[in-house]
């Protein structure tokens, strides 16, 4: 394999990754499909209206639970990211022109689906003068204007730590501002070369100082040690992070980083306990947890704790 699906030549790192075959999943990585009435209704509505959600397009294992709670996730900014993280399935390349009508369409989708809580995430847009800050902020504003009773969670890139860009995004006042650190300092540069660990922590601190509920995520199985996970959790809490999700890395393709280890369910229980002891007000940890999993429930739990 020398060419990526999007047509570009593979990076040397991707060629090296591809030398390791896709790993066999352990028995505890299994999804049970429970299709309740809310899920069934949303599924038919999405198909009928031609709507697009990350939940379906990324094959999220938690779609049955989230849609039953009337929660869904949307991807904005296109399908090409200007950065490349070694765990992420989104393609790296030159994005299409900015679609200024996208916020309205997302807001319409939220209304059509009757969502109680919507998560919005997107690609990095370093090609734009503002790094995409307007697009992220305007999407929140559009959702809130059309759906005043719907909670909004916004998962952002770091916008290179630029205060003006962060201020634009924070000013849209999502219920939760999320920025995912994803991994520990020792391997951070290898896994997320276009980001820095310190800057990611600073983004969370700035959001907390702006009065927002903050959230982050750690992916396990990328080569970190348990002690490093505990240290990263302490760093995140010290930076002002309110909510943490802890997940198992599942390799999207052979050109992505190999799975270094399968973290056992009991280890996730221990990490969750440690996070709670550190003072996180919302914690979810498990092999199939994803950063937007039960997002509305975690927000409400955190809001009660801060009241």
UniProtKB/Swiss-Prot annotation:
Residues annotated as domain Radical SAM core: 67-281
Annotated binding of [4Fe-4S] cluster 2, by residue: 81, 85, 88
Protein's cellular compartments: Cytoplasm
Gene Ontology cellular-component annotations: cytoplasm
A single GO molecular function term of this UniProt record: metal ion binding
Annotated SUPFAM superfamilies: Radical SAM enzymes
Manner of cofactor binding, per the entry note: Binds 2 [4Fe-4S] clusters per subunit. One cluster is coordinated with 3 cysteines and an exchangeable S-adenosyl-L-methionine.
Ligand binding ([4Fe-4S] cluster 1): 55, 60, 66, 292
Protein's recorded name: Lipoyl synthase
